[in-house]
Amino acid sequence: MNVAIVGAGAAGLMAASFIKNEYEIHIFDHNEKIGKKLFITGKGRCNITNSCEVQDLIENINTNKYFCYSPFYDFTNEQVINFFNSNGLKTKIERGNRVFPKSDKSSDVIKVFEKILKNKNVNLHLNEQVNKIYKSDTFYLTTSINKYSFDKVIIACGGKSYPNTGSNGSLYNQITRLGHTINEMKPGLSAIILKENVEELEGVSLKNIGLKCYINNKMIFNEIGEMIFTRKGISGPLVLTLSSILSKKNGDIKISIDLKPGLTDQKLDDRILRDFSDNQNKTIENAISKITIKKLILPILKSANINPNKKVNEITKFERDNLRKIIKSFDLTYVSNEKLDYAIISVGGVDVNEIDPSTMESKIVKDLYFCGEVIDVDGFTGGFNLQFAFSTGYLAGINI
């Protein structure tokens, strides 16, 4: 029995780890090394999973969460952690139940797989792109170098995000030729581009702020956390999560930042009055310097229609109310998610209705399997997407 795995990313590598040792395994990847995207995940630290309850893993899937019951319960986050621990990788749990290598090095995760592949005598075909897959009595693969035949094939070629890591969607036309449906690919876990010019705020980081989002005046998101301004918009943990939700939404989208989520309107007004009382002869720009960070003061005052050079003792109650409202609701206009090339993951992929969730085998083509980001499932930030890659890779591997 010989097996081809197309893609040496998280899902493909996990699949190879669990295929029977007596099978002949071939992994194809057009990169020069395995785990290229894995290497950069979690800013090079590799957030391998999340240690929450399994049901919470499922709740942190944005698209087609029902498909994840079998994968997540058959190969749980605890089993993922045990897999790496038993293969010599020590792990640690950080804020938000995020699991990382104790070394903080994604390269150590890749070393685990390198060792496994070596012990299993896996045939690695690096710098070799699969151009064509078709099936008659068996599977035939045409690559940039050669032609091969295989009994079974696992497609783990990834999505369309970060194309320079290899997940560029180049195999998708072959997947459709095999009879499968590819749902539209969109950016997920990405920065958000705004209508407003925020270039002067680039690099400004905000912690413990509230982020709300409204579609046609209906609130669809309300979370507290961190974000950062970019040259064209906003990014950071809260924004990444919101971007995935917005990837499949339409309508009039407004985003609002609550700079003081811990204060009620009344308590914030009391705080402003106290600062005004202490700084009556100063300009409003200087008087509110303790309420928010320096770079946000002028944009806040502009939104509140207050002259920054106006003395505090000249500020009217109407202006003070405006100031309070802007601090509690600094409004921004959504334009789009950042381009797919710059997204952490892609939304879309092979339709889950065409895949058996308990085995990852195609319902259309016998002996064809899918795992990882190529499937139309995407999760929020926090280790959930890698858990999906590992769980589906495991199922594909053990069911070969």
Q: What positions do the PLM features span?
A:
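N-terminal Rossmann-like FAD-binding beta1-loop-alpha1 element of flavoenzymes
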Residues: N2-I27, A396-I400
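Short hydrophobic core segments
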Residues: A4-V6, F28, V130, Y148-N164, ...
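An anion/pyrophosphate-binding glycine-rich loop and adjacent beta-alpha core
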Residues: E32-I34, I40, I48, V54-Q55, ...
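A conserved short coil-to-beta-strand element within the FAD-binding core of flavoproteins
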Residues: L126-T138
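Glycine-rich loop(s) and the adjacent beta-strand/alpha-helix scaffold that form part
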Residues: K152-V198
